[in-house]
Amino acid sequence: MKIDPIHQFNIEPLFTIGHIGHQTIAFTNSSLYMLIAVAIISLLMLASGAQLVPGRLQSVAEISYEFVASTIRSTAGSEGMKFFPLIFSLFMFICVSNLIGIIPYTFTISSHLIVTAALALLVFFTVLIYGVAKNGLKFFSIFVPHGVPGYILPLVMFIEILSFFLRPVSHSVRLFANMLAGHIALKVFAGFVAMLGFSLGALGWVGGVLPLALTVALYALEILVAFLQAYVFAILTCIYLNDAIHPGH
């Protein structure tokens, strides 16, 4: 029995939309699950309503709203709430996409670097454009930390500038790598249990009890990671936006 933990990440075309020169434009499984994630979030927001006694959907929507709002206020202040639609959308999209990807035989959008890089670049250019538009040249004071001795200031400035422009890399790779590694580990453990059962029969299934228990534990951990990675992406977005809102702090 062959175990291929990488096959689950393959982007497969579902149907062709058209052609641009020699390049085929196709609707892929990645596109499909992006639409599914957006549809689930939209339905959650629309179905939550505004009842005096909140139901389950409204409770989920309200908890999500308050969680993101409190995260923004604690990291970027009340002025950061103007970015609430962006941060809330990013948090919900990543969280729902991650949770969908945990379901067997589905597709994990955030396990592809091109997707996480697009989200990280959106945050990066939002910070850069807003920071310059709001603060002018004062925005670049974030590259000059207070209290640094003059003789090492050029080195510190170089490090600060480098770290600023590397933010999209760390922001995107963190999410991508965690989701990729977790799903590969889950696939390997589950495949090992199945291989024992099919290869050794009843004896294999008995021997597979421990790996199966580890697979269940790993699956539960992946559910936690799905929420945690969405939170980490959102709070880093808040921290980066705080530089644009309060560049001198």
UniProtKB/Swiss-Prot annotation:
A GO term from the CC aspect: proton-transporting ATP synthase complex
Alphabetical list of Pfam families matching this protein: ATP-synt_A (PF00119)
Stretches assigned to coiled coil: none
Transmembrane segments: 33-53, 83-103, 113-133, 139-159, 188-208, 216-236
Gene Ontology BP annotations: proton motive force-driven ATP synthesis
UniProt membrane topology term: Multi-pass membrane protein
Keywords: ATP synthesis, Cell inner membrane, Cell membrane, CF(0), Hydrogen ion transport, Ion transport, Membrane, Transmembrane, Transmembrane helix, Transport
Subcellular location(s) of the protein: Cell inner membrane
Superkingdom per UniProt: Bacteria
GO MF term list: proton-transporting ATP synthase activity, rotational mechanism
Function: Key component of the proton channel; it plays a direct role in the translocation of protons across the membrane.
Subunit structure: F-type ATPases have 2 components, CF(1) - the catalytic core - and CF(0) - the membrane proton channel. CF(1) has five subunits: alpha(3), beta(3), gamma(1), delta(1), epsilon(1). CF(0) has three main subunits: a(1), b(2) and c(9-12). The alpha and beta chains form an alternating ring which encloses part of the gamma chain. CF(1) is attached to CF(0) by a central stalk formed by the gamma and epsilon chains, while a peripheral stalk is formed by the delta and b chains.
HAMAP family with a match to the protein in the record: ATP_synth_a_bact
Family label: Belongs to the ATPase A chain family.
Protein name as annotated: ATP synthase subunit a
